Regions:
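Thiamine diphosphate
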Residues: 2-10, 15, 49, 113, ...
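Conserved internal helical-beta-strand scaffold that buttresses enzyme catalytic cores
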Residues: 1-363, 368-399, 413-415, 441, ...
Length: 934
């Protein structure tokens, strides 16, 4: 298919300025081709040769001859061609920089410099050229040739009106041309019917009407309204309708508090009476739940569109701005995976941002960076920046960011940005039409930058004029978008003042009656569009769960995960690992951690539980223990044995190495797990120390979502932990922080110390219907410790033990009990045997929370003669489990009524988790073990 010159020009990185360079290369090719780089030699050799020609001729002689020809009438044509080129450059300048002169700010206070590139004089054209006709192709005016005056007028209407677009940094030329055509072709202009215009008006009225009603009914109470950004309501309404028309059946929204109440009532269909009850605090909070403020709560409903019914959900969120972004994306990916939506057209994520947060919060960049990765791609996100040009009290651009626009961060993934003036609601809806179609066609992110303002303070009780006196003086006299649009429709004779009054009156009556004011709500919603969580509610943690597995099936699966295709060439390390796994499966070798973990996945997959694992380096494992994916040493192709098992049992096994992010990736996995409870969702930290890079996700979602929003999640966190001389940044998963956050059985914290324990722990998490996050303090050195192994029998016939007793038989001779968790057990046990401390029993507490009071009591009751009991931990005194668990252990001891007190052996209190010198570490560890045993 032939390309036009314009298409070639648009797709090329070359320009007229490179012509001399190309000429010199060509002359070299003709005279001394051996001096050329190979790629240029190939290029010139492949140039087409005219049939019956004399071949290639040096241009130097031709140029010399032309220089000697007298200038004549050709000069006129040269001048015309030159001016034609100038017009093309002018057109391109508007495509590149027209947005910089667009009328985007409703208040007209935005600094807008005059862009010289957009003046005809800058390109060597004059006023005398305005009425001369030039070729434009058909993108601009609808005709091949038109006057410069009309060209400029069209360019200014398209690129410098109340909408501005940035897209010329996009590398894919087909995307650029598509966007260019959407904006420039008159055939693509969206004309609004009377019905369309009145619908927009009604939506604007609902936005302003609810804000005024709440202001009158609840003066001074925080509402975080969208006064000044009322066009957001018709914008969101258009997003839902357009996505539905394009074939989506689910839309997941994420947004902060500003405007949330308005969208809940006017778009999603929350009953006004329910909102008023929240203001009046008529509701009750049951049990240990805390609830949350009304502008953090989620909601869902089904809305009818021309393309069918769409399930719309708004995620609950904290006040921590933008942290909901990856959570929503994870939820969308889970829905797509559940539906088998490989093209990612059925479920659409829509994220609403504030301008200050979008440019300021790092999780935005992390979330954007995930957009085209294999493990986190959701087919493109529609971003809507509610750009009220102020963040609380900060409005000076020199304070809030270092870029021209708050949306410039989106350019890192080449997302097109459509800036639009919120006081032009029709153009706002136009922006939506382009954005939704772009996302649907290219499966990539797109940004709508809604320029607006904040009519009131950060909250309604705040006076913003103290810090922005000029802005709020301007706002005080600025008519609302509803009033402006009303006048426009009256002038166009689509609306009368009487009709406008009736619309406003009817809306207020609906509010007062408490009935729904949203449009197009489904009266009989299709319940197949959401997941039924009923079987996962009110499940207790303490009943025993059968995690055994038939041995014959076990060894059959073990053989499959230890094999690769005959033609597959494993490397030396992987070959050794797979050979050892075959021996473990045959009972020749004891089972190590890596094999046990992989077998946990294999057995669950064979029972049709889907599994998803992400994190940095998870396919191999940071410490080379997992090797869930192996690579052919000759062609580099990967092979995942567990995927074959998943396919055979009609389920999924997804394991992805993540980008180097903790916060966004953990947020994504939380969202995934909170949407699809059927299987096992796992996030592994490279080292447990790095989990605090995602502390906001832990605090605001993982440990508290159930009690704030009644949202369940079965997410598993694998956090490598252990004191092995690697310094303060590679030793501690900060157990103390997780334990401090434990309350009301909100999470599980476990420290498995053997392969059989991790096998049963992972199986328990999937099989048991309780969907509570599981924090696994996983080992590092134990992955290869020959003492940390298990038998096949322990895996196929055993269970997860919250407390593991000492194997000592003569318990009556025990006078001292050491309680511990994790790796330190093996250090203690080794020295205990060397020193023949037969009077000491080592008891491991493998589940730190919920604390196994009864299990510990049962074990301790076997020791009738112990005189001393201590808690031994590797961590410093002020860290680890001591402060959170000494009273729990003591509570168990008090049941025996013998007044024994738990004592501690640990490292001294320290500001950092561990020392940075191996020599000092070994000294400390030796002393710790000696103190515990003596």
């Amino acid at each position: 298919m032939n390309q036009t010159m314009e298409e070639l020009w648009e797709s090329s990185h070359m320009s007229a300025g490179h012509a001399g360079y190309l000429e010199s290369l060509y002359e070299t090719y003709l005279s001394n081709p051996e001096e050329l780089p190979e790629e240029w030699l190939v290029f010139f050799k492949n140039l087409p040769i005219q049939p019956n020609s004399n071949g290639e001729i040096s241009h130097k002689t031709i140029i010399s001859e032309f220089k000697n020809i007298p200038r004549n009438s050709v000069v006129v044509k040269d001048e015309v061609d030159e001016r034609q080129g100038k017009v093309i450059r002018l057109i391109q300048a508007y495509r590149n920089r027209g947005h910089q002169e667009a009328k985007l700010d409703p208040l007209g206070m935005m600094d807008r410099n005059i862009i010289e590139d957009l003046n005809i004089e800058f390109h060597g054209l004059t006023q005398d050229d305005l009425d001369e006709e030039f070729y434009t192709d058909t993108f601009i005016t609808g005709s091949a040739k038109t006057s410069l005056r009309e060209i400029v007028d069209s360019l200014r209407k398209i690129y410098c009106g109340t909408i501005g677009v940035e897209y010329n940094y996009i590398m894919e030329s087909n995307e650029r041309r598509w966007l260019q055509k959407k904006f420039e072709s008159k055939l693509e202009k969206y004309n609004f019917s009377k019905e369309d215009k009145l619908h927009i008006y009604e939506r604007l009225n609902s936005a302003e009407g609810l804000a005024k009603y709440l202001a009158a009914k609840y003066p001074g109470m925080k509402r975080f309204g969208i006064d000044g950004a009322e066009s957001l309501v018709p914008l969101i309404d258009a997003v839902i309708q357009d996505c539905g028309e394009l074939g989506a059946n689910q839309i997941c929204f994420g947004m902060a508090h500003r405007g949330r109440l308005n969208l809940l009532v006017n778009v999603l269909g929350k009953l006004p009476e329910d909102l008023f009850s929240a203001f009046d605090e008529k509701g009750t909070i049951e049990g240990s739940n805390t609830g949350d403020v009304k502008y953090h709560l989620g909601f869902s409903s089904n809305i009818n569109t021309s393309g069918g019914e769409v399930h719309v959900s708004l995620n609950s969120n904290p006040s921590h701005l933008e942290i909901v972004d990856p959570v929503v994306l994870g939820s969308v990916r889970a829905r797509q995976d559940r539906l088998g939506d490989k093209k990612r057209k059925k479920v659409v994520p829509v994220l609403l941002h504030g301008d200050a947060a979008f440019s300021g919060q790092g999780v935005v960049m992390e979330s954007l960076q995930m957009s085209q990765t294999r493990g986190f791609n959701v087919g493109g996100t529609i971003h809507i920046v509610v750009n009220n040009q102020i963040g609380f009290t900060t409005s000076n651009k020199n304070d809030s960011r270092s870029t021209d626009y708050s949306t410039d961060v989106a350019k890192m993934i080449q997302a097109p940005v459509i800036h639009v003036n919120g006081d032009d609601p029709e153009m706002v809806v136009n922006a939506v039409k382009i954005a939704t179609k772009y996302r649907n066609k290219f499966n990539k992110d797109v940004v709508i930058d809604l320029f607006c303002y904040r009519r009131r303070g950060h909250n309604e009780a705040d006076d913003p004029s103290a810090t922005q006196p000029l802005m709020y003086k301007k706002i005080a006299s600025h008519p609302t978008v509803l009033n402006q649009y009303q006048e426009k429709l009256i002038q166009e004779e689509f609306l009368t003042k009487k009709e406008a009054t009736i619309i406003k009156t009817n809306y207020r009556k609906s509010l007062e009656s408490g009935i729904s004011v949203a449009k197009n709500l489904s009266k009989n919603p299709n319940d197949s569009l959401w997941f039924d969580w009923t079987s996962y509610l009110d499940v207790l943690w303490w009943p025993k769960v059968d995690t055994t597995f038939p041995k014959k099936k076990f060894t059959n699966l073990g053989s499959k995960i230890s094999s690769v295709p005959n033609s597959f060439k494993l490397g030396i390390q992987a070959t050794k690992i797979f050979e050892d796994r075959k021996k473990m499966n045959e009972g020749v070798l004891e089972i190590n951690w890596g094999f046990a973990e992989n077998m946990a996945y294999a057995t669950l997959l064979s029972e049709s539980f889907p599994i998803r694992i992400t994190g940095q380096d998870v396919r191999r494992g940071t410490f080379s223990h997992r090797h869930a994916c192996v690579f052919d040493k000759e062609d580099g192709q990967g092979f995942i044995p567990l995927s074959k098992i998943a396919q055979a049992h009609n389920t999924r096994f997804d394991i992805y190495d993540s980008l180097l992010s903790e916060e966004a990736v953990l947020g994504f996995e939380y969202g995934y797990s909170a949407t699809w409870p059927t299987g096992l969702t796992i996030w592994e930290a490279q080292f447990g120390d790095f989990v605090n890079g995602a502390q906001v996700v832990i605090d605001q979602f993982i440990v508290s979502a159930q009690h704030k929003w009644e949202r369940l999640s079965g997410l598993v966190l694998l956090l490598p932990h252990g004191y092995e001389g690697q310094g303060p940044e590679h030793s501690s998963a900060r157990i103390e922080r997780f334990l401090q956050l434990c309350a009301s059985e909100n999470i599980q914290v476990c420290v498995p110390s053997s392969p059989s324990q991790i096998f049963h722990l992972l199986r328990r998490q999937a099989i048991r219907k309780m969907r509570t996050p599981l924090v696994v303090i996983s080992p590092k050195s134990l992955l290869r410790n020959p003492q940390a192994t298990s038998s096949i029998k322990e895996l196929v016939d055993g269970s997860f033990k919250c407390v593991i007793d000492d194997s000592v038989e003569e318990k009556a001779k025990i006078t001292k009990i050491i309680l511990c968790s994790g790796k330190v057990f093996y250090d203690l046990n080794e020295q205990k045997n060397i020193k023949q401390k037969h009077n000491i029993a080592l008891i491991r507490i493998e589940q730190l929370y919920p604390f196994p009071y009864d299990d510990l009591q049962e074990v301790l009751s076997k020791y009738k003669n112990f005189e001393e009991i201590i808690w031994c931990q590797e961590e410093p005194y002020n860290q680890g489990a001591w402060f959170s668990h000494r009273h729990r252990i003591q509570r168990v001891l008090d049941r025996f009524n013998d007044k024994k007190q738990i004592k501690l052996v640990s490292r001294p209190a320290a500001a950092a988790p561990a020392v940075g010198m191996m020599k000092l570490h070994l000294q400390q560890q030796t002393q710790l073990v000696e103190d515990a045993l003596e």
